[in-house]
Amino acid sequence: MYIAADAEACVHLVERKVLLHLSEEEKEAVGPHRWVLDTGAMNHMTGSRSVFAELNTGVAGTVKFGDGSVVAIEGKGTVLFACKNGEHRRLDGVYYIPCLTTNIVSLGQMDEDGFKVDIESGILRLYDLQRQLLAKVHRSASRLYFLDMNIAAPVCLTMHVGDVAWR
């Protein structure tokens, strides 16, 4: 993981439609690879430091959630996902909030970034910038959209050429 402390920033977010703590039913549905595709969240957020491919720890501040709780932001970065077809996709602008027990993808932020979000008849479809289908997710019984995504570890490839000439 790449960690940078440059470009320090102090942010104060308000997430009125996001709760810090889930209901018992929702807790059972959430796992480490599960992300909530949230129409009410204004920002991508996670409480798991290990998911970041890049993390700028110079970004700090607070976020106030809908239940009134205020917690610390300890970074902002990029999460790299491994798709089923072997490709990797980046999710940029993800806040690291250690107290958060859920991984959240803000559909509003995705729309702002040029992605297409389509929700119809209990099915959410997410399209990339080229309008290729990225995800098709059925609404859960708790009226949330959960997507299981595999985190890709960034790989640094190097090559060393010695003094031996090719023959």
Where are these regions (language model features)?
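Short, conserved interaction/coordination micro-motifs, predominantly
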Residues: 6-25, 30-34, 141-167
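Acidic/polar residues in short coil/turn loops that connect beta-strands
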Residues: 67-68, 85
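Gly/Ser/Thr-rich beta-alpha loop segments that engage phosphate groups in nucleotides
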Residues: 42, 68, 77
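Aspartyl protease active-site motif detector
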Residues: 14-64, 90-106, 145
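General beta-strand structural signal in soluble alpha/beta enzymes
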Residues: 64-65, 119
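Short active-site-adjacent helix-start/loop capping segments
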Residues: 44-45, 72-74
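Aspartic protease core domain of the pepsin/retropepsin superfamily
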Residues: 73-76, 80-167
